Curated annotation (Swiss-Prot):
Substitution effect: residue 127 to Y: In Montefiore; O(2) affinity up
Mutation effect (residue 111 to D): In Petah Tikva; unstable; causes alpha-thalassemia
Effect annotated for changing residue 113 to D: In Hopkins-II; unstable
Effect of residue 81 to R: In Ann Arbor; unstable
Binding site for heme b: 88
Binding site for O2: 59
Protein name, UniProt field: Hemoglobin subunit alpha
Listed PANTHER family: HEMOGLOBIN FAMILY MEMBER, HEMOGLOBIN SUBUNIT ALPHA
Gene Ontology cellular component list: blood microparticle; cytosol; endocytic vesicle lumen; extracellular exosome; extracellular region; extracellular space; haptoglobin-hemoglobin complex; hemoglobin complex
Modified-residue entries (Phosphotyrosine), positions: 25
Effect of mutating residue 75 to G: In Chapel Hill
Effect of residue 132 to P: In Questembert; highly unstable; causes alpha-thalassemia
Organism: Homo sapiens (Human)
Positions bearing the site annotation: (Microbial infection) Cleavage: 9-10, 14-15, 25-26, 30-31, 46-49, 53-54, 56-57, 60-61, 92-93, 107-110, 122-123, 134-135
Length: 142
């Protein structure tokens, strides 16, 4: 999915508002995903998945850091996320549908925390951005 210049501006502005809360929001999105889509827990059998778990917080920070990297390299996401794509495709073997589920939960989390900034245009831009990230992460499955 191609991001327009307006989409890129919206994504960078919205992610800038996330700022220091990125890890917290990443963990919250993971918790939402685990509660809403319990089958996603199968990829984390070694994690304590309870609310506030240090492992979920740690992985939430990893998710947020990867998204921060994608925002910073929005014009070259395939190269920026190449190692992460390899990891998820070849080692972790995560079903690609799970990226869509996490993206949805992240959008809900951002809407809850940033209601003033989460306009329809920003929502659409973030949705396109997360779809692009998902596409890049699943590109090495083929």
């Amino acid at each position: 999915m191609v991001l327009s210049p307006a989409d890129k501006t919206n994504v960078k502005a919205a992610w800038g508002k996330v700022g220091a809360h990125a890890g917290e929001y990443g963990a919250e999105a993971l918790e939402r995903m685990f509660l809403s889509f319990p089958t996603t827990k199968t990829y984390f059998p070694h994690f304590d998945l309870s609310h506030g778990s240090a492992q979920v917080k740690g992985h939430g920070k990893k998710v947020a850091d990867a998204l921060t990297n994608a925002v910073a390299h929005v014009d070259d996401m395939p190269n920026a996320l190449s190692a992460l794509s390899d990891l998820h495709a070849h080692k972790l073997r995560v079903d690609p549908v799970n990226f869509k589920l996490l993206s949805h939960c992240l959008l809900v989390t951002l809407a809850a925390h940033l209601p003033a900034e989460f306009t329809p245009a920003v929502h659409a831009s973030l949705d396109k951005f997360l779809a692009s990230v998902s596409t890049v992460l699943t590109s090495k499955y083929r």
